[in-house]
């Protein structure tokens, strides 16, 4: 009887895992799950964040971008976002940046990463969308852990 219950329990758990596995692997609309390898669009963006290069990073911003940096949230122009990121990188020089989750859905791609800057740990979320002329950053969030 015990063996029968254990087998049924294992089968039940296996069915649940197999049912949820595709949802977890494909992202299910949640940016915290998905492919570990970032899309090619995020390769240069990651490089510019790691280098603390606000000028090159801002070239990937739409004309208006939603920026959330250390509890300052605003929708701003590309030039304002460039200045805000430049000021952040001056105060917190990046030491490392690594993407650990990525997801995509239709014309939107997003990644979640960790950045160490100025001895502090930050969570970074980047949302890029394609409006016909390629992927550009529409939203960037940098929050201290």
Q: What are these language model-derived features?
A:
Residues 41, 45, 53, 80-85:
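Stable alpha-helical elements in mature extracytoplasmic
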Residues 13-14, 20-47, 59:
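Short, low-complexity N-terminal intrinsically disordered segments enriched in polar/charged residues
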Residues 66-74:
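A short gly/proline-enriched turn/hairpin at secondary-structure junctions
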């Amino acid at each position: 009887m015990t063996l029968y219950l254990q087998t049924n329990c294992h089968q039940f758990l296996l069915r649940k895992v197999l049912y949820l596995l595709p949802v977890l692997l494909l992202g299910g609309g949640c940016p915290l799950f998905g492919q570990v390898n970032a899309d090619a669009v995020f390769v240069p963006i990651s490089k510019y964040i790691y280098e603390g290069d606000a000028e090159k990073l801002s070239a990937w911003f739409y004309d208006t971008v939603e920026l959330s940096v250390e509890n300052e949230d605003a929708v701003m122009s590309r030039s304002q976002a460039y200045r805000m990121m430049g000021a952040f990188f001056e105060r917190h020089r990046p030491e490392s940046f690594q993407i650990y989750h990525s997801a995509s859905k239709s014309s939107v791609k997003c990644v979640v990463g960790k950045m160490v800057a100025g001895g502090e740990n930050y969570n970074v979320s980047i949302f890029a969308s394609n409006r016909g002329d390629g992927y550009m950053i529409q939203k960037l969030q940098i929050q201290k852990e």
